[in-house]
Amino acid sequence: FKSFLPAQEGLTTEGQKISLGLSTYGLKLYYMLGEWENLNNEQKNEWVEYINSFQKNYKKLPKNSYVDKVVYDFYNNNTFRGLSKDYLKKTLNIIPNLNYEIKDTQFKKAINAETKQAIATLDQVGRSSEKLFLPDISRSEDMKKYLDSLNWSKPWTSGAQYASLCVYSKVNEDSNKQLLVDYSNLLVNEETGSYYKETPNHPREIINGAMKVLSGLDWLGADIHYPEKLIDYCIRNKPVTEGCDIVDYVYVLYRCLQQTDFKKKEVLQIFDDSINDIRKLYYTNLKGF
């Protein structure tokens, strides 16, 4: 579990060294494939302890974040080229309607993603963090301000940040559950059933954004607002045959069927077709998709 790699070749230098994200990913795969239960208690505990060993305290990061040193060093390697790009972005951001992410923002989002994934995966196998994670954004007024600052015309990224707050709320005794549920009321689109403010440019973005927000609502134990509308939208906008698009699409339909039987027969057929599409992406020689 310490040397889990997602591919046999094609990895970057950093990709060959990172540990936390891939170990967490490996644990999730073990759980999904039923292999987790085949491990003995000592093996399970060792894996959980390994993931929890990444809980660290760094400046500019929330207390007890999950931090892979390789990821930390990558984002904090201040090369001349990197500093120049950041300076240019900051300058361009002065112009109205431009909002380029500087490296520090990208770094914090990366750590947030790894922290959320670690906490969520541990919860999935009935385990928890060794130390309580304390997000920077915990007060209601700060959380509302943060959510308002996100670009909701790109719900696949903003939705990911929303979902992470839902995870943190759940593990901290539902501390901001009502605020997050109320905020989803502001995002939902009555026509598509998805969640955004300004309409994204492509259907795949609308479906992917729905996947992110629906995963957050699942953590909150909250209902999907318009599951029938979302099912109709997905049926009208089938994805291209790419891994992430298919998985996002299937997840959205699956979650909707948990709440309604609307067009259930048609959706179940889509699931069967999607399995065949996913099989086409499998490379036998690489033993992966």
List each language-model region with its residue ranges:
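Well-ordered alpha-helical segments within folded domains of soluble proteins
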Residues: S19-M32, A110-Q124, K154-S169, E205-L217, ...
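Long, repeat-rich segments with strong aromatic
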Residues: V167-E266
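Helix-loop junctions that connect tandem helical modules in alpha-solenoid scaffolds
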Residues: T12-G15, I102-F107, Y146-P155, S194-P200, ...
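Extended ligand-binding groove/face enriched in aromatic
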Residues: N38-D182, L186-E190, V267-D273, D277, ...
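Positions within ordered alpha-helical repeat solenoids
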Residues: M32-E35, S53-N57, Q124-R127, L186, ...
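Low-complexity, Ser/Thr/Pro/Gly-enriched N-terminal "stalk/linker" regions
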Residues: F1-S23, M32, E42, V48, ...
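Carbohydrate-binding/catalytic loop surfaces
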Residues: K2-K17, S65-T105, K197-K212, V252-Q259, ...
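Extended alpha-helical scaffolding segments
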Residues: T24-Y31, L39, V48, V250-F289
